[in-house]
Swiss-Prot record:
Name assigned to this protein: ATP-dependent zinc metalloprotease FtsH
Source organism phylogeny: Bacteria, Pseudomonadati, Bacteroidota, Flavobacteriia, Flavobacteriales
Gene symbol of the encoding locus: ftsH
Pfam families in the cross-refs: AAA, AAA_lid_3, Peptidase_M41
Subunit description: Homohexamer.
Spans within the Cytoplasmic topological domain: 1-11, 153-619
Amino acid sequence: MDKQSKFRIKTFFKKIIFFLIIFCFFYFFNFIKKTKKITHTTQDKFFELLSKNKINKFIVLNKKKVSFTLNEKKSHLDSNNYNFFSKLHLSRYEFEIGDLQLFQKKIDFYKELYEINPNFEFKNYKIYTVLNFFYDYGFFLMIIIICWIFIFRKIASRSSESEFKFKIGKSKAKLYYYNNITFKDVAGLEGPKEEIKEIVDFLKSPNKYTKLGGKIPKGALLIGPPGTGKTLLAKAVAGEAQVPFFSLSGSDFVEMFVGVGASRVRDLFYIAKLKSPSIIFIDEIDAIGRARIKNNIPGGNDERENTLNKLLTEMDGFSTKTNVIVLAATNRYDVLDDALLRSGRFDRTIFIDLPSLKERKDIMKVHLKKIKFSKSIDLDFISRQIPGFSGADISNICNEAALLAARRNKVKVETKDFIDTIYRRIGGIEKKNILIKKNEKKRIAYHETGHAIISWIIEYAHSVFQITITPRGQSLGAAWYIPEERQITTEDQMKDEICTLLGGRAAEYLIFNNKSTGALNDLERITKQAQSMVKFFGLSSLGNISYFDSTGRNDFSLEKAYSEKTSEIIDKEINKIIKEQYKRALEILKKNYDKLIFLAEKLFKKEVLFKEDFASILD
């Protein structure tokens, strides 16, 4: 049950309690009134008391009955027994009068005889007060009120539903007038920031460009992998320009009702124009911007296409004086419609790549501002351990390292906390309680040592700095490397990487004269590497040809881009590359057989070896 439902139930019961209190209040006072003591007497007794002037007041009810109270004062009462309830229970006397005319004549006679002037009145109706009403009908009235509340709430909910039907076509964008995020909060991304700073300048001083005949860009498309800072960069644009910022996701346009998406697009741009200069940011625009189906296939998403068509017309229908800029982000650039990507809609396409080594260090510095860390922390070493990590990944690493240091009861976060967090992120949680047989443990030690020796010896392999046979995640051991930052990769570098990955299986075969299932991950990676060399990069005897589809639109096609004969050649080339590198790995390990035995036995005993442990031996 959500908080709003709990609040409604709590409010309803408060109302019930309130009505119960009111009912009990009236019931109590009416009960007090009805509990007054009534004494039946005679007419003779009445006139006897009247003659002594002891009657305070009497009332003739419906010409048949007389009700009176005595004129006794508090001093005449027993002071010892007098209390609040005694006062509530003052006696009231009643008697039947019979003939009314005879009774009136007798009253007049006593008035003249005893010279008294009694206080009396005639009432020809039943005494029925508000208290009597609540006493008689209060319970039923309370039930009616409760039912009325239920009905009213139902009508109100129906009314809100009907209002929802009218509001369903309205934009769901969140409007931010002021944003504290600036370009200083966006670490790295120096290239994209420089390109997008011009958009900020357009919003701040558009006349600077329009007076020369230039037109304000209508949109910019941010493209990059998840977590690279596309949304953060868009927020920084709004923060720098200090203009209204409309933020929503592409899926916010999509609804089960026909025509809602187009209506929301229309409403969004209408509001943005009223508040111009402004920025519209559409995250995950591929939800509505996918390429339209050329053939009329049954079951196609016509509603999404209608939404896209409306978005296209709104973006292309901008006036140059509206100062409304559309920013959109996606990690599926390949599936977007060509009409959306053309100039005049998204005039600029900004690619945001995964951060480089320097950018990773800058991102870590931003996230470390809120963390207490040791001054001896090695940011360069940590940054080298996380190639391919996005800004979101680095943020998570910093946070997890702080949590790990807290669990270890440390005052500050140290380098070891970061490294252990990275290992956990890449390899999984360390499994200290898993039982491994001695012969299996020895095989794992030789497997990991084989990786380390080959990566140390061959030229283009990544530098190894630690090997371990401690189970972690789904692996029983691991060799950790410091990857080299590369923008392009040569054929020799790719072959060296394959050779390093085959070093583990080669070491097993060399020592135990058989193979095991422990090389599954290695085999998967080398197969993909060899496939990419042959099919995509043209690094084989097949020639300078590539079957790579950068658009990604033929992923589900049943037709291959090459013949069956070419497919056989590709398979042979892949197999040839892998066999050559496996043979090469065996030769390297045979030449370093003694070192392999020594390091593997040492790893078997210690379970973890660092660069310092095997550097002197391998050098």
